Amino acid sequence: MKESIFSKKRILLLGSGELGKELVIESKRLGLEVIAIDRYEKAPAMQVADYSRVIDMGDKNILKNVIKEFNPDYVVPEIEALSIEALKELEDEGFNIVPNARTVEITMNRDKIRDLASKDLKIKTAKFDYIFEFDDLEKKADEIGFPLLLKPLMSSSGKGQSLVETKNDLQNAWKQAQANSRGKVKGVIIEEFINFDFEFTLLTVRKENGENIFCLPIGHLQSNGDYQCSWQPLEIKDSLIIEAKRMTSRILNNLNGAGLYGVEFFIKGSEVIFSELSPRPHDTGMVTLVSQNINEFELHLRAFLDLPIPHIYLIEPSATRVILSNQEYLNPIYEGLNEALEFEKTKVLIFGKPVSRKGRRMGVVLSSNSDIYLARKNADEAARKIKVSTT
């Protein structure tokens, strides 16, 4: 009898948040062994993994040592705050970095992915520049014009991002970007504010053979760069989707690593404007847990494990709305679950984070309906029923 390819496969997950948790669950369904790594104990993915370890992932030697200790078949980054030098050296030594170390490096730094898209591939983006000293900021802000966006070169989930209305706001925005910057780079990206009509995510699966497979577009809303809600499918003109797919293919053909990518775009009139790219399951893609026949987490696994990916189709229009905490609690509890679960075709996912903070994402509501408007309405109303509290 032929041995299952999964009988000895081991995945090491770098970052163990809510997206990592869903990836671990899908991995366990395929019989894989998973090690979850993060910088704090009891992170969501650690609660369902086979093994876990708390380390400083930004320390090259510590990260290399723990990866060598567990000797995984695949190293799967879930966050940006880690030592890229360690990943590059380990890849040279024969470890499989998903999708590859170069892609992780390019996408974890806003300057590198913007340079690749705008300068190398001539893909339309917002006007931008990089600033490393505050004294240079005011002059560049005048060139780009107000309002504008200021972001750390390296951060995640919109942390440190500010909408700057006037010169008087530059100092506070600079301080916020510096305080929320991850890694050793303390520069910022100053970016034209685009008064877009809407924005969306195009989940794209890159197979080992170089084929790109596209999911239906996902609409989403953000606040200060952080995802608040999403829905699939998004009503959008075919011509705009064709252009977004063309842009995505050009970028992924350059990065060339198997896995799932979350590619974000702005739409302004007839223009498609590239925004950001993540080489892993995407926040907005949590809607696929109920909307698609194969969710984004399983798609990521199938892609880098080189497993078949049959036709991806919509089961039913669906929507999400995040559950946010309004203050800090240790071992938080959740009130209103009974009321939230009274909504038809609605699920609640509690991430299991051990500590809540003001504005921290603690869970998500998923709702389906043949009418996308009702799916969004039910997700919104159910989420409002849930309050993060403490005993």
Curated annotation (Swiss-Prot):
GO terms for biological process: 'de novo' IMP biosynthetic process. It holds the Pfam family RS_preATP-grasp-like. Pathway: Purine metabolism; IMP biosynthesis via de novo pathway; N(2)-formyl-N(1)-(5-phospho-D-ribosyl)glycinamide from N(1)-(5-phospho-D-ribosyl)glycinamide (formate route): step 1/1. Mg(2+) binds at E264, E276. The keyword Nucleotide-binding applies. Gene3D superfamilies: 3.40.50.20, ATP-grasp fold, A domain (3.30.1490.20), ATP-grasp fold, B domain (3.30.470.20). Residues 115-305 form the ATP-grasp domain. Keywords: ATP-binding, Ligase, Magnesium, Metal-binding, Nucleotide-binding, Purine biosynthesis. It catalyses: N(1)-(5-phospho-beta-D-ribosyl)glycinamide + formate + ATP = N(2)-formyl-N(1)-(5-phospho-beta-D-ribosyl)glycinamide + ADP + phosphate + H(+). Disulfide bonds: none annotated. PROSITE patterns: ATP_GRASP. Its EC number is 6.3.1.21. InterPro entries: ATP-grasp (IPR011761), ATP-grasp_carboxylate-amine (IPR003135), ATP_grasp_subdomain_1 (IPR013815), PreATP-grasp_dom_sf (IPR016185), PurT (IPR005862), PurT/PurK_preATP-grasp (IPR054350), PurT_C (IPR048740), Rudment_hybrid_motif (IPR011054). N(1)-(5-phospho-beta-D-ribosyl)glycinamide binds at E18, L19, E78, D283, K353, R360, R361. GO terms for cellular component: cytosol. Involved in the de novo purine biosynthesis. Catalyzes the transfer of formate to 5-phospho-ribosyl-glycinamide (GAR), producing 5-phospho-ribosyl-N-formylglycinamide (FGAR). Formate is provided by PurU via hydrolysis of 10-formyl-tetrahydrofolate. Belongs to the PurK/PurT family. This is Formate-dependent phosphoribosylglycinamide formyltransferase. It comes from Prochlorococcus marinus (strain MIT 9301).
